[in-house]
């Protein structure tokens, strides 16, 4: 689960639709994921997913690796389901 309190202020003050899409993209990146896989899962174009992923990566929210992108661990909070 994403810890929204640790996200940058600019993301939290982004207009509603754009913010919702960015949160959805971040949720896809909780596990290693490529831009193409995230775009298919969210039913958006690869270019739109690339554009938002680029913004999120440039501000330091994502790690990049051979399997795609992943949300940095400090932005993920553990949820106890007991």
Language model features with spans:
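A short, conserved structural fragment
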Residues: 57-68
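Short amphipathic alpha-helical interaction segments
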Residues: 44-57
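Short, amphipathic alpha-helical interaction segments positioned at domain boundaries
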Residues: 76-82
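Short glycine/proline-centered loop/turn elements that form peptide/ligand docking sites
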Residues: 11-14, 31-34, 48-51
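Short alpha-helical segments that sit at the start of domains
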Residues: 1-23
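Short acidic, hydrophobic short linear motifs in intrinsically disordered regions
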Residues: 29-41
